[in-house]
Structures are given as C-alpha cells and as structure tokens.
C-alpha cells in the first residue's frame, strides 16, 4: 500500500496521486529550482510504490512543464516551476489524455525497443525530396487548394486499382476515404459507430491505442484470444451472439503485438460469422507489405460481399511517417458516415501530402525500396532473435511485421523489468498495455525495427542482465 494514497484508491490513478504529492513538496520548497529530483528508484522506495508508478508521475510533471529530462541523468525541475500559478494548476486527469504507450515512447533512451517504427535510416530519404519537388512541379497550386474531404480523386483512383490488382479487392474510388493516418481512421469509425456502453470485440492482446480510442467513446471491450494459429472461431461466434458488438476490431496480418497471421480459411469464416451476426469487422492492416518470405493472405475485405468489413490500410510507418496517409475501404452506409465525420474532424487530409504519396508509393523506385526494406528488417529480426536465445525467453517467430511478442521467465514481471530498463536507458512495451484485461504481465513486446543492428545486440545484452537481476 502506498504511503501517500489510501488502499481504497483506484490503482490506475496511483501515479496521479504521486504526482500531486510531488507538486505539494515542490511548493513546500523541498527541492530547489533547476534542482535534480530523486531518481525513480529512490522515490519509489521512499513512497512505497512501484517504480513504474513514479515514472508515470514524472511524465505528468514533464507534460505539465514543471520538469525536464536530461539524457542518462534524470529528471530536473524547470525554472519557474515553483510559481503559484503553475503549482496551482492541477494535472488533467481525463481518460483521453492517459496514454501509457506514448508515455513510454517519449522517454529519451539509447535502446528503443518500444517503437514499432522504422529506423529513419531505413526510409527512402535520399529520393523523397525529389518527389516533393515533383509534386510542386506537377501541381504548382497545391498549397493554395483544399483537398476534397474524401481525398484526392487521383489518389483514390490509383489506390482502388492497386488494391484490386494486389489483393483482389472489388471496390470503387467512391468506397475509399483518405485519412491522416490509421489512428484518425479508428477515431472516425469509433465516433460514427459507438455510443456509451456499446460492446466492441478486440483481439487479446491488441494495439493499446485502439483500446484507448474505443474506451474514450464509452465502449465496453470484450476480449477475443488470438493464437499462433489464429482465432478460436467458436469463441468468436459465442461473443458475437452474446455481446452483440457494434464491431470487432482485429489485426489479422502480422498482428500487433504478436506477429501472428490468420489463415485465408479463417478469414473467410470470420466474414461469414460477421454476416451471420450482423457484426462489422474493422480490419487494421499496417504491415501488409512487411513480409519476409511469402506475401500474407488477402485482407478480409477481399472475402466480403455484403458490406461487413471496414478495411484500414496504412502506409506511414514504412513509407514516410511525416506524410500520415491511410486509406479506409468501406461500403455504404459506413463510408458515408465516415465522410461526414471526416468533414467535421479536419475537412480533408492536406492535398500536398496526398500528392507526394501518390508520386512516391506507386513508383517503381518505391517498390524496389520495399524489397530491400524487407531484407533489412528480416536481418534485424534475426539479430534480435539470436541475441535473445538462451536467456530463458520464448516467442513465436513472425513471418513479417516489426515486433516480437516475448514470454518472460517465470516470476519476472514486465512492469518491474521496464522500471529497471528505463534506469538503464532501455524501453519496451509491457504486455499489460496490450491486454484489454490489463494482465499479461509476463509478456513484453520488443520492436526490432527502430534500433540499429549494434543497438539491438547491445540492448538485448543489457536486457539479459536485467533479467538475471530479477530472477
């Protein structure tokens, strides 16, 4: 039990109470301006709380402008942080602003295993600028023009042709919406489909930010277990029948965080179950092009003839994150409702980024780059797997994507391991963040795509030492 919080308190709010206690102590002058705050370990021991709780409290201080981080040194108070106006401003505690994954990813560390993003050196930086110039040459008025809310017609037409050729998707450009990234697409879908207390099926484990979005609209999440072989379809059918969900959010291709891929046979059956129970399937497909040997099966949308699949295809992670481009394929009336929500959200994704993406993605040069990128990521995955072997961990080898879903040795908890890792400039994603039941404290997600090859080897050696210290 924390020394500063009653035992009846909600555990999820404990870090906020710690933050409030720190603010009071700052106000009392216990720490001087620009002075160093106690280390995460020291304050956790003093207060009788977990180190991860103190880490989250320090992150709140940082976000509110009262503290800053020095790399490999710790947290320091900012000048002026003791002013009455600042200390009187309470931390904002709304659910929407709680994002544990974002908190972890913002920590400046040397060994960054929490980011399912590409090492910037793997992106097509050398010739991206050429396509930016080409966009201005071909569309000189691009900055003086709003894009249509649904997206640039030229891009939507090219995307419809691409999806038809690559994945056998039968759709028109009118059934596509261009969004500013996949996360906006998820938010628009939740906004148009959900009302408080609606049930939503989600994979267990799943993408943590998606759960945050759905919960922010009042959804009640029901977990569907995903395994290396896919889903227990009897469980899916039972939950669809009993919970009558508004939709089932799933990630069947190089699943985040597990890396699993659902077979074509199961995809067909999932679409049949969706039609049988009148449940929309929301398919999130961020890694379709990141395969190491054979391409994955076609998206669920390819098997849908009755409008029970909304397909989100994103490209930002491996093309150019700054472009923030995704496409949503859906039938009527879903696409019409999304269009209305998009018009209220931002009235259209910027035309310039759409034109740059159009020129870049469909070029022969980009397709050659993707072939090299798959090889580079496969090499990095192998490096991480080799480094992880022999230290008591287990995982299922993925056939693509950016992550390993790793089971820790018996008795080792992900939260404790992360707290130690942060102290040693290493981060990863604890399994609890990916679990709708907030369990999986014996699992971690390690991303092999952001760190370079030397950092992968050195970081895993450091991780092995941390594991030994907790064994």
Predicted region positions:
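Conserved core segment of the aminotransferase class I/II
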Residues: 305-375
């Amino acid at each position: 039990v924390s020394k500063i919080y009653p035992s009846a308190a909600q555990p999820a709010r404990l870090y906020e109470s710690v933050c409030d206690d720190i603010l009071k102590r700052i106000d009392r002058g216990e720490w001087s301006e620009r002075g160093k705050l106690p280390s995460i370990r020291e304050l956790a021991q003093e207060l009788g709380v977990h180190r991860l709780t103190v880490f989250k409290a320090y992150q709140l201080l940082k976000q509110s402008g009262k503290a800053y981080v020095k790399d490999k040194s710790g947290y320091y108070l900012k000048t002026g942080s003791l002013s009455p106006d600042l200390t009187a401003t309470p931390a904002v505690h709304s659910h929407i602003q709680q994002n544990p994954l974002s908190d972890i990813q913002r920590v400046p560390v040397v060994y960054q295993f929490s980011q399912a993003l590409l090492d910037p050196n793997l992106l097509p930086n050398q010739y991206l600028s050429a396509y930016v110039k080409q966009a201005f040459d071909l569309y000189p008025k691009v900055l003086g023009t709003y894009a249509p809310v649904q997206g640039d017609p030229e891009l939507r037409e090219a995307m419809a042709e691409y999806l038809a050729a690559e994945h056998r998707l039968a759709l028109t450009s009118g059934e596509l919406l261009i969004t500013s990234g996949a996360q906006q697409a998820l938010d628009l879908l939740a906004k148009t489909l959900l009302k408080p207390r609606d049930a939503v099926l989600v994979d267990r484990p799943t993408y943590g930010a998606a759960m945050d979005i759905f919960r922010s609209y009042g959804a009640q999440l029901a977990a569907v277990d995903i395994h290396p072989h896919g889903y227990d379809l009897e469980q899916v059918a039972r939950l669809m029948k009993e919970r009558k969900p508004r939709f089932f959010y799933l990630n069947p291709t190089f699943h985040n965080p597990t890396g699993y891929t659902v077979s074509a046979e199961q995809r067909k059956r999932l679409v049949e179950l969706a039609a049988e129970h009148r449940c929309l399937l929301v398919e999130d497909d961020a890694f379709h092009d990141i395969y190491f040997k054979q391409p994955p099966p076609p998206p669920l949308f390819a098997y849908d003839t009755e409008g029970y699949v909304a397909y989100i295809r994103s490209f930002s992670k491996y093309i150019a994150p700054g472009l923030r481009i995704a496409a949503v394929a859906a039938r009527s009336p879903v696409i019409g409702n999304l269009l209305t929500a998009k018009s209220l959200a931002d009235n259209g994704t910027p035309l310039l980024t759409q034109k740059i993406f159009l020129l870049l993605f469909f070029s022969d040069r980009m397709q050659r780059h993707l072939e090299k990128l798959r090889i580079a990521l496969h090499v990095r995955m192998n490096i991480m797997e080799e480094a992880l072997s022999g230290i008591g961990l287990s995982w299922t080898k993925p056939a693509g994507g950016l992550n390993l879903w790793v089971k820790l040795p018996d008795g080792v908890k992900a939260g404790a391991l992360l707290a130690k890792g942060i102290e040693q400039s290493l981060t990863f994603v604890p399994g609890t963040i990916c679990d709708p039941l907030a369990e999986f404290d014996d699992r971690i997600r390690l991303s092999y795509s952001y760190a370079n090859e030397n950092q992968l080897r050195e970081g895993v050696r450091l991780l092995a030492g941390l594991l030994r210290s907790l064994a």
